[in-house]
Each structure stands twice: as C-alpha cells, then as structure tokens.
Amino acid sequence: VIGGAECNINEHRSLVLLYYSSRLFGGGTLINKEWVLSAAHCDGENMKIIYXXXXXXXXXXKDRQIRVAKKYFCRDRKKSVIDKDIMLIKKPVNGSTH
C-alpha cells in the first residue's frame, strides 16, 4: 500500500505479507488455516509468508515467517498481460491462530 497508515494488529488479522529475496513484494489474504489468496504477479522464488505484522519491518518478524508449501495458478494464465492474476498459496498446517 502506498501512502497507507499503520493499523492495530488485531484490525486485519487475515492480511499477510509476501516476502522473498530479502524484500517485501506483495500481500495476501488468509482464506483459512491452509490457504492464502494473492495476485499471481506477486509470485517469487523461495517466498515466505509473514503474518501478524503491524509494520513493514520484516526483519523483526522472523518468528512469524513460514515457508510456502505449494502455489497454484490458473492453467491458461498469460504472464505477458495481467490476465487471471490469481495465486492460491498452500501453507504448512500448524497450530497458529493466524
């Protein structure tokens, strides 16, 4: 978000950050304990999901980073244009409340 304001961590518990290559690259929404919905153009190698982050300080959120188990895209998606720009991310199942 450009020009956004920090919010209380409990206001948007379903929001996550997508992080890879030492930088934040996008966001997503928790659908349930196993799945995150994001835009396909936010895909990256060795992506991690950061949950319960109140600020964009990813270095302080090491304990809230999880690896991606698998990513799914539309079969007939065209990368050359923003077409069917949806990515489902399966995350490892754990006992977290996030």
UniProtKB/Swiss-Prot annotation:
The keyword Protease is annotated on this UniProt entry = yes
Gene3D superfamilies recorded for this chain? Answer: Trypsin-like serine proteases (2.40.10.10)
Q: Which domain of life is it from?
A: Eukaryota
Q: Which GO terms describe its biological process?
A: proteolysis
Record GO terms (molecular function): serine-type endopeptidase activity; toxin activity
Stretches assigned to the Peptidase S1 domain: 1-98
Q: Which GO terms describe its cellular component?
A: extracellular space
Q: Where in the cell is it found?
A: Secreted
Residues annotated as glycosylated are 94
> Which InterPro entries does the UniProt record give?
Peptidase_S1_PA, Peptidase_S1_PA_chymotrypsin, Peptidase_S1A, Serine_Proteases_S1, Trypsin_dom, TRYPSIN_HIS
Active-site residues, as the UniProt record annotates them: 41, 85
**Where's it mainly located?**
secreted
What is the annotated role of this protein in its UniProt record?
A: Thrombin-like snake venom serine protease that preferentially cleaves the alpha-chain of fibrinogen (FGA). Induce platelet aggregation in the presence of exogenous fibrinogen. Possesses esterase and amidolytic activities.
- Record-given protein name: Thrombin-like enzyme cerastotin
Whose protein is this, by species?
A: Cerastes cerastes (Horned desert viper)
